[in-house]
Amino acid sequence: MTVHIGAAPGDIAETVLMPGDPLRAKWAAERFLENPVCVNEVRGMLGFTGMWRGNRVTIHGSGMGMPSLSIYANELLRDYGAKTLIRIGSCGAMQADVKLRDVILAMTASTLSTPSSGIFRELNYAPCADYGLLQAAYKAAEGKGSPIHVGGIYSSDVFYDERPDLNEQMVRHGVLAVEMEAAELYTLAARHKARALAVLTVSDHLLTEEALPSEERQSSFSDMVEIALEAAFS
């Protein structure tokens, strides 16, 4: 048990999928895992452990933003011995050829700031995904026929960002999408010698201002979860 996770030793699997929304963690566990058991509900942040095709998996919420994810990822890696963390979540597309419901595999995650930025000081650290996970996820997505994009994303600390100039530069430099967690996830995984990947579904589009209706978001995320699970155990 840690300050923010109430799970007992051994309750957390070495492979953890991390949606931002704790209710999405519950939905994914009930839909994809056999015999899921709730292992954490401290502060309403739900975590479940169960089996998928004979493999033990935990699905645990991270909350919104890098400061929140940093708390849970640190404790999962440091105190519970997690070896593989895969973020499953939504993102906003920043390129014209990326469409709603497409899946994005984040090869790199640029950011202005993470909770780890004070460690690096003047160094412009470049967080990146684990290549083995990235390759496995790409193959899994290809097998499903899912529209998929691989490349850099941007992790923002601010949801309501009033920086149109920054967005323009992201688009100009080929950044695929914006979200709020992956840069810190990749940084922490590197520090703890673990594997990490962000598998994202496009729910909004910054260029066209399109957005998935709330009732479609959950049903559109099934491919993303299956890709993450297949990548983790390929």
UniProtKB/Swiss-Prot annotation:
SUPFAM superfamilies xrefs: Purine and uridine phosphorylases (SSF53167)
Recorded superkingdom: Bacteria
Residues in coiled coil: none
Signal peptide positions (record): none
Alphabetically ordered keywords of this record: Glycosyltransferase, Transferase
Binding-site list for phosphate: G20, R24, R43, R87, I88, G89, S90
One Pfam family in the UniProt entry: PNP_UDP_1
Catalytic residues as annotated in Swiss-Prot or TrEMBL: D204
GO-annotated molecular function: purine-nucleoside phosphorylase activity
Any single GO BP term: purine nucleoside catabolic process
GO cellular component: cytosol
Record-annotated disulphide pairs: none
EC number: 2.4.2.1
Catalysed reaction, written as an equation: a purine D-ribonucleoside + phosphate = a purine nucleobase + alpha-D-ribose 1-phosphate; a purine 2'-deoxy-D-ribonucleoside + phosphate = a purine nucleobase + 2-deoxy-alpha-D-ribose 1-phosphate
Site (Important for catalytic activity): R217
Annotated residues for binding of a purine D-ribonucleoside: H4, E162, E179, M180, E181, S203, D204
Function recorded in the entry: Catalyzes the reversible phosphorolytic breakdown of the N-glycosidic bond in the beta-(deoxy)ribonucleoside molecules, with the formation of the corresponding free purine bases and pentose-1-phosphate.
Subunit structure: Homohexamer; trimer of homodimers.
Family, as annotated: Belongs to the PNP/UDP phosphorylase family.
Protein name, per record: Purine nucleoside phosphorylase DeoD-type
Taxonomic source organism: Jannaschia sp. (strain CCS1)
Gene: deoD
